[in-house]
């Protein structure tokens, strides 16, 4: 009963499995799936690279994301330059690294 249930689940989840074709070399790892159900053998040791079908990018389609949103080393969604004072005590000062919105050793960092 359990085996029937497992087979049914497998068939429901993986309905379009393609069986591999064993080549003359005896290796099942040397095959190329052209489309489901069709397997084309490659020469021993050959690797076929997939075709690249990329269209050239037209204009700047990427949106700039904010580098930071809050923190003592963040101003208007941009990181403050390295060396900018982010926290000062009577004994010492702490400076932004230019790579993080958090101040090193800032008490609000936890």
UniProtKB/Swiss-Prot annotation:
Residues 1-20 form the signal peptide. One of its GO terms (molecular function) is toxin activity. Its main location: secreted. It is found in: Secreted. This is Disintegrin jerdostatin. Gene3D superfamilies: Disintegrin domain. The keyword Ribonucleoprotein does not apply. GO terms for cellular component: extracellular region. The keyword Oxidoreductase does not apply. Monomer. Recombinant protein inhibits the adhesion of alpha-1/beta-1-K562 (ITGA1/ITGB1) cells to collagen IV with an IC(50) of 80 nM. Disulfide bonds join 68-77, 73-96, 74-101, 86-103. SUPFAM superfamilies: Blood coagulation inhibitor (disintegrin) (SSF57552). A motif (Cell attachment site) lies at residues 88-90. Negative results: does not show inhibitory activity toward alpha-IIb/beta-3 (ITGA2B/ITGB3), alpha-V/beta-3 (ITGAV/ITGB3), alpha-2/beta-1 (ITGA2/ITGB1), alpha-5/beta-1 (ITGA5/ITGB1), alpha-4/beta-1 (ITGA4/ITGB1), alpha-6/beta-1 (ITGA6/ITGB1), and alpha-9/beta-1 (ITGA9/ITGB1). Two conformers are found, they may differ by their disulfide bond connectivities. Conformer 2 is 33 times less active than conformer 1. Conformer 2 may represent a non-native protein. The C-terminal dipeptide may be post-translationally removed, as seen in disintegrins that possess a KTS integrin-binding motif. Belongs to the disintegrin family. Short disintegrin subfamily. Expressed by the venom gland. Residues 27-110 form the Disintegrin domain. The lineage of its organism: Eukaryota, Metazoa, Chordata, Craniata, Vertebrata. Keywords: Cell adhesion impairing toxin, Disulfide bond, Secreted, Signal, Toxin. Residues 21-67 form a propeptide.
């Amino acid at each position: 009963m359990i085996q029937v249930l497992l087979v049914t689940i497998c068939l429901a989840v993986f309905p379009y499995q393609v069986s591999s074709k064993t080549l003359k070399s005896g290796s099942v790892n040397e095959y190329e799936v052209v489309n489901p159900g069709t397997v084309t053998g490659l020469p021993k040791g050959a690797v076929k690279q997939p075709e690249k079908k990329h269209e050239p990018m037209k204009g700047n389609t990427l949106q700039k994301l904010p580098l930071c949103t809050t923190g003592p080393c963040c101003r208007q969604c941009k990181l403050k330059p390295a060396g900018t004072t982010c926290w000062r005590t009577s004994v010492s000062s702490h400076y932004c690294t230019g790579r993080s919105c958090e101040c090193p050793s800032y008490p609000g960092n936890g």
